[in-house]
Amino acid sequence: MYSDKKNILQLVALLKAHGVRKIVLCPGSRNAAIVHTLANIEDFTCYSVTDERSAGFFAIGLSLQGGGPAAVCCTSGSALLNLHPAVAEAFYQQVPLIVISADRPAAWIGQMDGQTLPQPHVFGTLVKMSVNLPEVHTEEDEWFCNRLINEAILETTHHGKGPVHINVPISEPIYRFTAKTLPEVRVITRYQGLSVYDRDYKELIERLNKYNKRMVVVGQMNLIYLFEKKYVKPLYKHFAWLTEHLGNQTIPGIPIKNFDAAVYSMTPERQEDMAPEILITYGGHIVSKQLKKYLRNHPPREHWHVAADGKIADLYGCLTTVIEMDPFEFLEKIAFLLDNKPTHYPLMWENYCKTIPMPDLAYSEISVIGKLIRALPEPCALHLANSSTVRYAQLFTVPPQVEICCNRGVNGIEGSLSTAIGYAAASSKLNFIIIGDLSFFYDMNALWNQNYGANIRILLLNNEGGEIFHTLPGMDKSSRSREFITAEHYTTAKGWAEERGFIYMKVTGEEELEEAMQPFTSPETRMQPMLLEVFTDKEKDTTLLREYYHGLKNKNE
């Protein structure tokens, strides 16, 4: 019988699954549940060593002799500090070592309870990774716990070998051993390249070929990659390709970009039917909340993330494999290894998404964004500020020769204008910037320098506050909400824009917009940058947005 603590069960099951076999066990009360469970697994060879300082070096010897990582488990408090010399040796000798420490719950650290000290990250820079496991009470806790353990074990041999530290908080009661079996756990694997000299990848291709519903989701990529013609058809026909404008031209063919609205419109039955069996991802962040929710609720059997840095990014909660290589090299490598069995899955997605209409709304924030996007000259660069701007732009088709930029690393509203101005300063193309009022005024000092030219066209959407916050569930429109959440204001950019040498234009309605859009989007060279400030009504903006999405829901009823 094993401990009933789920974080312990996850840890032990993953040590076993990752092939860790040699474990040094130090006596103690707080770690007794871990020790008891480890000692009762036949796959492990356990060694009892009382002195933790000696135990750490003993574990180094085990690892050196076997090649794979060995583990050492100790109780809480100063016992852990006694492993420090061995951890330092393992780090500088590059020996894979897993240090497992039991701990009290965080609430009792520093409260004069016995045998306690702040254990997370106690080894500082002398370990490759340090993780503090959650105590598992929810499904999300269990997913988080599983991910942390996978990350730590994989890190022992990633880009060189070395020690890692796994800290395991354990609440009372500690000594309940009621679990009859170890749980079935998700094991994350890593391929460092696809080379027969590094790791046999035939098994990987066999896994890929057994699925019919294959999807690729591409996140933000600040580049353009044109696939050679010979790769385009073999790759394109086998997958449903989804990306956003921020993915730019990084797909072998024409991708599906309106999937956010499409997923929102689907019935539960259609969502289930169109869910992928395997998901491959590359690139950075995805804006779509609908896609994140969809793939978390309908997880594929496998999720492979392809990234040159090999880091674990489990956005959809179902990651199974990390492939550490350039994503384009990966795709070109597998292109001719894919089987030729017919699949209708890509067409299912293409045909359904073609039924989703673009917004055709009255004068509003969304309609203004759509009008500019349709009028963009090619080639040019389009910079999208965060919050509503980047989301609403996704509802429209962007011309193919338009490069898209956005600060989606942390997704804050600050710095959107400064980043765009900096980009334009080194660009020979026209640079269009769509930005909301809060983001613009927050970053208005972006124009307080001399390092920009006439190739800048700023579309400032001013509805006197952050209207997107009123679309959030539970947000009322009281005076307090308007003041503290929407941050209502009555500011205009006119004086600042003209002071900084911009041609300023003001729009308050559809006719003025039509008149201003032609000079604003003209590719003709001008002597000054331009700022077009468009005023809309935030109540109308949110109402029209809701009506559009309500119409999508009704299309299948």
UniProtKB/Swiss-Prot annotation:
EC class: transferase
Cofactor: Mg(2+); Mn(2+); thiamine diphosphate
UniProt remark on cofactor binding: Binds 1 thiamine pyrophosphate per subunit.
Translocase is among the record's keywords: no
GO molecular function: 2-succinyl-5-enolpyruvyl-6-hydroxy-3-cyclohexene-1-carboxylic-acid synthase activity; magnesium ion binding; manganese ion binding; thiamine pyrophosphate binding
UniProt catalytic activity: isochorismate + 2-oxoglutarate + H(+) = 5-enolpyruvoyl-6-hydroxy-2-succinyl-cyclohex-3-ene-1-carboxylate + CO2
Pathway: Quinol/quinone metabolism; 1,4-dihydroxy-2-naphthoate biosynthesis; 1,4-dihydroxy-2-naphthoate from chorismate: step 2/7; Quinol/quinone metabolism; menaquinone biosynthesis
GO BP terms: menaquinone biosynthetic process
Keyword set includes tRNA processing: no
Domain of life: Bacteria
Entry EC number(s): 2.2.1.9
Any coiled-coil regions, as ranges: none
Keywords for the protein's UniProt record, in alphabetical order: Magnesium, Manganese, Menaquinone biosynthesis, Metal-binding, Thiamine pyrophosphate, Transferase
UniProt subunit comment: Homodimer.
Family the UniProt entry places it in: Belongs to the TPP enzyme family. MenD subfamily.
Protein name: 2-succinyl-5-enolpyruvyl-6-hydroxy-3-cyclohexene-1-carboxylate synthase
Organism of derivation: Phocaeicola vulgatus (strain ATCC 8482 / DSM 1447 / JCM 5826 / CCUG 4940 / NBRC 14291 / NCTC 11154) (Bacteroides vulgatus)
